[in-house]
Amino acid sequence: MNKHALIIGASGVIGSNLATHLLAQGWKVTGVSRGRTPVPAGCVSLQLDATDAAAVASGLAGIDASHVFFTAWARQENEKENIRVNGAMVANVLAALGQNGHAGHLRHAALVTGLKHYLGPFDAYGKGSVPVTPFREEQGRQDVENFYYEQEDRLFEAAEKYGFSWSVHRPHTIIGYALGNAMNMGLTLAVYANLCKANGQPFVFPGSSAQWNGLSDMTDAGQIARQLAWAADSPAAANQDFNIVNGDVFRWKWLWPRLAAYFGVEAAELPDTISPLAERMDGAAEQWRAIAAQHNLVEADVSRLASWWHTDADLGRPMEVMTDMSKSRKAGFLDYQDTPEAFFTLFDRLKAERVIPL
């Protein structure tokens, strides 16, 4: 049976890695983006604002997708706006595909959210009753406003109406190759380390003592791509929610010196108070332009590489955050990715692509 994937957010860190993975498996892939960053080679590119219902209906007319993957979100000023805008993205796309879905074309829709399902949104960390780690799918929703819940509800509603199966995927922080992405810790830390090296400064952990000392895990973009592909046609994954992480655990106080050693910078001890990157990177734009010119790098705009705010938010959490993968494994997804290796593989590629200095 032919497989045609429609990927919403195909130029992002998850969407681009998913597109590459599906293309290698022989899928037809249509990649939806706003056009600021190219989609992977081999994708049919569709520039579209998924928040615009009329544009979505027009742009997706005639698209006979068998599977749709939601891998993007649009950050707004507050959670009410996050709910309105990001819920509409899911609703608009599924409504536009609905008639095709009712006719039997659309078989499955996958939604990528994240661990804020358990923690609450960025501006409400810890306001609900945060579950005990490791987070498990049956722990359910927090009693706070959260755009993830709105997206899920729109997904469930459309699946019941049009008769396709669904899956929800909850990664931890993503490591993967993508430029111009709003949430990319691996690239952010690579840029930060190179700025430290250029300035002769130590590599200071920008987060909390809870994150430094507690157990943690992460999600490689290739790992979630493989789970999304597996869930697309696996009966055991139909109408299920799954956590998705690499499968190992670590402590930042163990990993941080290893990242520093890769870049040849000094790993500082944990400071007495949190030292957010956003407060220390005022001069980063000018400094990065100089580094890019000196090393002939492909991107001189640091804002397209580093997401200081997102890395601060993840590493500044006041609690331990880690995830249980038992449900996914019991259902048949057994893939594993070594986390330090994921970082170093990403850093090697960033050097090879001239994103960071050799």
Segments the model singles out, each with a brief description of its role:
Residues 68, 88-147:
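Conserved Rossmann-fold NAD(P)-dependent oxidoreductase catalytic core, especially the SDR/UDP-sugar
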Residues 191-219:
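A conserved pocket-lining segment of Rossmann-fold NAD(P)-dependent short-chain dehydrogenase/reductase
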